[in-house]
Amino acid sequence: VEETLMLKGYFAQSKSYILYRSERTRMRAQRKSICSLFAEGDALEKILDKVQTDFPEEMYELSRLDEKFRSFLKPEMGESAKRAALTRAAAELTTQEAPHWEFIAARILMHDFPADLSRALDELQLHSYFEKVSYLCERGLYGSYILESYTKEELDEAGTFINPAHDEKLTYSGLELLLRRYVI
């Protein structure tokens, strides 16, 4: 592509393209450096790619996260411990000058939750929002007034209001508190 641009006299465009490609290669290398330390790094790479898109500022470069993360690594660490260390590294990079590391830490923390939740729901054979609410009411974790006040259709409709994209608005401290104290 660069050669064609150069031959046609588009020197500025060629330079821009070369710089763009070089930057993309550098960013990919940063992601791969972190993901190479995990057995299943594909899902994590998608998260880190989105982090690079959403937080393009220099203070949020993944090389900083990689360096901090590697300082926590120990040879005997399993996948779960490594993910916890990566989350901790992102959380510890949070400063007044770089407050968005807390959102990045939350995204990493949230990495395993959907799969864990799906497994738990499959084990309990809960497939609709109504079934989830019914299960929690039966165990006394939700008030029975919910089932008395709403129909199955209304509860299933309420379940459609949940938008996983909003998970990215949670900070690490908020998500950690939510998962530890309130997720049933």
What are these regions (language model features)?
Residues E2-I184:
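Extended catalytic cores of very large enzyme megasubunits
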